[in-house]
Amino acid sequence: KQFTKCQLSQVLKSMDGYKGVTLPEWICTIFHNSGYDTQTIVKNNGKTEYGLFEINNKMWCRDNQILPSRNICGISCNKFLDDDLTDDVMCAKKDLDSEGIDYWLAHKPLCSEKLEQWLCEEL
């Protein structure tokens, strides 16, 4: 599914303020990772990254490419490609708990200041 900024802001409201990360920071980071498209798959340094949050198959989810995956989220990577973001959010929070927001490389250079453009006026 291709989300808009406002659709995604609505769905991800529960992430606002989690571990000190604001919703606009998430919206910006997701935009730079996946362009708000749940079908995103990126091959990167021998890993494959899935979905809005670019969750990878080396640490967080399992697919049939890398054996063994640590599979910290205990889930198939393909679950991050569907329209239900519940499991994506759960795994992204685990990722954040473990690694911090700068684990998403777009965050620090692109999403740590001047965040007004990432707010949804409709909320």
From Swiss-Prot:
Instruction: Please name the GO terms of the biological process aspect recorded for this protein, alphabetically.
Output: defense response to Gram-negative bacterium; defense response to Gram-positive bacterium; lactose biosynthetic process
GO cellular component terms, semicolon-separated: extracellular region
**Signal peptide limits:** none
Q: Which keywords does the record carry?
A: Calcium, Disulfide bond, Lactose biosynthesis, Metal-binding, Milk protein, Secreted
Q: Where is the C-type lysozyme domain?
A: 1-123
Q: Where is Ca(2+) annotated to bind?
A: 79, 82, 84, 87-88
Q: Which cysteines are joined by disulfide bonds?
A: 6-120, 28-111, 61-77, 73-91
Q: Where in the cell is it found?
A: Secreted
The protein's superkingdom reads Eukaryota
Please give the Pfam families that the UniProt record associates with this protein: Lys
Which InterPro entries is this protein grouped with? Glyco_hydro_22 (IPR001916), Glyco_hydro_22_CS (IPR019799), Lactalbumin (IPR000545), Lysozyme-like_dom_sf (IPR023346)
Q: What is its main location?
A: secreted
Q: Name one GO molecular function term.
A: lactose synthase activity
Q: In which tissues is it expressed?
A: Mammary gland specific. Secreted in milk.
Task performed by this protein: Regulatory subunit of lactose synthase, changes the substrate specificity of galactosyltransferase in the mammary gland making glucose a good acceptor substrate for this enzyme. This enables LS to synthesize lactose, the major carbohydrate component of milk. In other tissues, galactosyltransferase transfers galactose onto the N-acetylglucosamine of the oligosaccharide chains in glycoproteins.
Subunit structure, briefly?
Lactose synthase (LS) is a heterodimer of a catalytic component, beta1,4-galactosyltransferase (beta4Gal-T1) and a regulatory component, alpha-lactalbumin (LA).
User: Which family does the record claim for this protein?
Assistant: Belongs to the glycosyl hydrolase 22 family.
Recorded protein name is Alpha-lactalbumin B/C
Species per Swiss-Prot/TrEMBL record: Equus caballus (Horse)
